């Protein structure tokens, strides 16, 4: 089998999900991850600086929406590099997070926490 045929065969058998245009989707007027869990932004993150300030212990309660290897910025979605070297998705320049206390899709119990966490609305 030549290389071209091998590449074509791999493309045919690769799940389309890895080619998704965006890391999030809209559900009930808010952004969610692929499991339907609500996404949040943090007021203390500076829009567009390519950095998350939610690290260490904070990140245990507010896990970052991490990008898979090979993830690429697209439209309103960009990537930021975290202090630990991981790559995190951002929307309109703001890093995206989940909230550990949300237990099922549609929960949005993190909205307004400490007046600095907010549900992301496109």
Region spans (language model):
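Bacterial N-terminal signal peptides
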Residues: 7-17
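Compact beta-sheet-dominated domain cores in extracellular/mature segments
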Residues: 19-122
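N-terminal secretory signal peptides that target proteins for export/translocation
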Residues: 1-2
């Amino acid at each position: 089998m030549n290389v071209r045929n091998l590449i074509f065969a791999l493309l045919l058998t690769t799940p389309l999900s890895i080619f998704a245009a965006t890391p999030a989707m809209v559900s009930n007027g808010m952004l969610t991850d692929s499991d339907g869990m609500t996404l949040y932004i943090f007021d203390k993150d500076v829009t567009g600086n390519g950095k998350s300030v939610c690290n260490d212990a904070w990140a245990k309660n507010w896990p970052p929406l991490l990008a898979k290897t090979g993830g690429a910025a697209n439209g309103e979605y960009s990537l930021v590099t975290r202090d630990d070297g991981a790559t995190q998705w951002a929307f309109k320049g703001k890093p995206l997070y989940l909230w550990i206390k949300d237990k099922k899709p549609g929960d949005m119990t993190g909205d307004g926490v400490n007046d600095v966490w907010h549900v992301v609305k496109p």
